[in-house]
């Protein structure tokens, strides 16, 4: 029998196959959940000294194996990307692409860099469109329209200030009419929408300022106005500086494999030397993309195509555009987590999502702790919400997607439980031992990142662990209980508003830990330290405290000598006046 004559599976067979995959996926997820919970709760020791002070348990072994596997697959993905052939792009057959930029109260310096980098993209001009949509049409928002017109002055740019948006109710009578009396004629459709679509589909460089509606409304306008006029759609934020090769490398990934529906690039920090927060964020970003997402890309299931740099197949995007925009959670319309839900919609269709380190951009990150905390809280909200949606489609992708989702979803809860248990029921050495293990694992992960990147400064990533434990961890629990509250969060940079709500869980967390610490110290002060086991514990406590202090002295010295000096000089960084 010839291959083309092979019988196709019947719909019933497809349904049975899909059901079987669902059952197996659920069983696998429950297995991972059960094993992790049992390993954590049972506390099975694998190795220990005679007094049980230096112990290594099954749960620790599981997490260590997870980090090793993740690092290995990330390395293999980088090897695969580096070995891939990269021939020149044929301008005659290049896919048509629309670069969409979402803008909201952007700092003028960042916006100018973004637009200039869009002009400098190495992609056939005839196959590339640039569309910026501004969230706001008031007088104070129009400086972004003027800047777009200025930067693209030689490209015959088109600009339009729209009184409404796609979801603003339009009244024909309010739009004006022709004639009088019984022969009065009114517009049948919103003339603003028609004008926007006509400009977007006929001009190469277009900027639209529309009625405020949030970032998702802005992105919807760009996607809807484009329709099916292009092959691929690139998303970008207005604080992002694109590498000249960024778009070309993304296009190559989609061109190489029709099963890939979306691809993301390497997002780096534009202002790493503004503060210690932005510096640690720059290191964390690199690991998040080049280790964690590179690992996911090895299995074709990247969980989030980041907003500053992503490319989607337009024919697929248009299929779920309305469902994406109208997403609701607990009865509330979702206005954040746009990028993660776009990725989830693509995954729900069974298409792969990829990451390539060859495509790169630079994006602004908060330099103040409070604004960083607000950003992380907002991102955590979308993570938990999208985790639930993502679970519906685990069966359509590699088992790694299920495994990693379960592990990463449970991790914050296990960390919080461990910390509280040690502070309230543990002895001083047990608490110090866990802190040493946490920093040891963080240092090992940072050392691998330093080797993979070829940059010794990456070892300072281990300083991010306390920031996670003391700041990000309580923020995640605030996000969990406020998932249905929405807003732009940290996206507007021209006018920064302080939001002190994320400090509340930090204060509660600090009080909980302080209470546990006081209780443990009071209990240990009454204990008898004369026995051999207590003497050994005192010795380990002194040695461990010395090692812990020595570690911090070394890391902080490296930071102050190698980084903080550069922060003062702002070498290689970007200082933006707000």
Curated annotation (Swiss-Prot):
Membrane topology: Multi-pass membrane protein
SS bonds (residue pairs): none
Recorded catalytic activity of this chain's protein: [hyaluronan](n) + UDP-N-acetyl-alpha-D-glucosamine = N-acetyl-beta-D-glucosaminyl-(1->4)-[hyaluronan](n) + UDP + H(+); N-acetyl-beta-D-glucosaminyl-(1->4)-[hyaluronan](n) + UDP-alpha-D-glucuronate = [hyaluronan](n+1) + UDP + H(+)
Main location group: membrane
Cofactor requirement: Mg(2+)
Function: Catalyzes the addition of GlcNAc or GlcUA monosaccharides to the nascent hyaluronan polymer. Therefore, it is essential to hyaluronan synthesis a major component of most extracellular matrices that has a structural role in tissues architectures and regulates cell adhesion, migration and differentiation. This is one of the isozymes catalyzing that reaction. Also able to catalyze the synthesis of chito-oligosaccharide depending on the substrate.
Name the UniProt record assigns to this protein: Hyaluronan synthase 1
């Amino acid at each position: 029998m010839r291959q083309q004559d092979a019988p196709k599976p019947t719909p019933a067979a497809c349904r049975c196959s899909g059901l079987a995959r669902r059952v197996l996926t659920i069983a696998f997820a429950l297995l991972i959940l059960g094993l992790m919970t049992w390993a954590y709760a049972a506390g099975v020791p694998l190795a220990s000294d005679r007094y049980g002070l230096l112990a290594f348990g099954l749960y620790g072994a599981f997490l260590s194996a997870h980090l090793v596997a993740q690092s290995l697959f990330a390395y293999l993905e980088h090897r695969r990307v580096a070995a891939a052939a990269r021939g020149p792009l044929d301008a005659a057959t290049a896919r048509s692409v629309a670069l969409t930029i979402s803008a909201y109260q952007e700092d003028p310096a960042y916006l100018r860099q973004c637009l200039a980098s869009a002009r400098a993209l190495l992609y056939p001009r005839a196959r590339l469109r640039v569309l910026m949509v501004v969230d706001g049409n008031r007088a104070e928002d129009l400086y972004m329209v003027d800047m777009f017109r200025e930067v693209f002055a030689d490209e015959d740019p088109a600009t339009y200030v729209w009184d409404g948006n796609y979801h603003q109710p339009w009244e024909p009578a309010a739009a004006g009419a022709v004639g009088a009396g019984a022969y009065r004629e009114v517009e049948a459709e919103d003339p603003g929408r028609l004008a926007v679509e006509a400009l977007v589909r006929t001009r190469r460089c277009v900027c639209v300022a529309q009625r405020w509606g949030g970032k998702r409304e802005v992105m919807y306008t760009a996607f809807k106005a484009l329709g099916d006029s292009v092959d691929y759609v690139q998303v970008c934020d207005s604080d992002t500086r694109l590498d000249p090769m960024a778009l070309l490398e993304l296009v190559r990934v989609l061109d190489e494999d029709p099963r890939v529906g979306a691809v993301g690039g390497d997002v780096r920090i534009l202002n790493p030397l503004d503060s210690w927060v932005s510096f640690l964020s720059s290191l964390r970003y690199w690991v998040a993309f080049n280790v964690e997402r590179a690992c996911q890309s090895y299995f074709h299931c990247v969980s989030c195509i980041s907003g500053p740099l992503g490319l989607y197949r337009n024919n697929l995007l248009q299929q779920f555009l309305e469902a994406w925009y109208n997403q609701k959670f607990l009865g509330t319309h979702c206005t954040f987590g746009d990028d993660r839900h776009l990725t989830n919609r693509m995954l729900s269709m069974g298409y792969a999502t990829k990451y390539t380190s060859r495509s790169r951009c630079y994006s602004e990150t908060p330099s103040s702790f409070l604004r960083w905390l607000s950003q992380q809280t907002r991102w955590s909200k979308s993570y938990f919400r999208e985790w639930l949606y993502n679970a519906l489609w685990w069966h359509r992708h590699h088992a790694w997607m299920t495994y990693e989702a379960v592990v990463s979803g449970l991790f914050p809860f296990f960390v919080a439980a461990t910390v509280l248990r040690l502070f309230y029921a543990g002895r001083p050495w047990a608490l110090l031992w866990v802190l040493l293990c946490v920093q040891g694992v963080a240092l090992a992960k940072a050392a691998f990142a330093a080797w993979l990147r070829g940059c010794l400064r990456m070892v300072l990533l281990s300083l991010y662990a306390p920031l996670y434990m003391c700041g990000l961890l309580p923020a995640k629990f605030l996000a969990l209980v406020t998932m249905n509250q929405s807003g732009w969060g940290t996206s507007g940079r021209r006018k920064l508003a302080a939001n002190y709500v994320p400090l509340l869980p930090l204060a509660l967390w600090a009080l909980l830990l302080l209470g546990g610490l006081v209780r443990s110290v009071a209990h240990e002060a009454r204990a008898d330290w004369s026995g051999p086991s207590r003497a050994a514990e005192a010795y380990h406590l002194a040695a461990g405290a010395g090692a812990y202090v020595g570690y911090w002295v070394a890391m902080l010295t490296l930071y102050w000598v190698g980084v903080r000096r550069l922060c003062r000089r702002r070498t290689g960084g970007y200082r933006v006046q707000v």
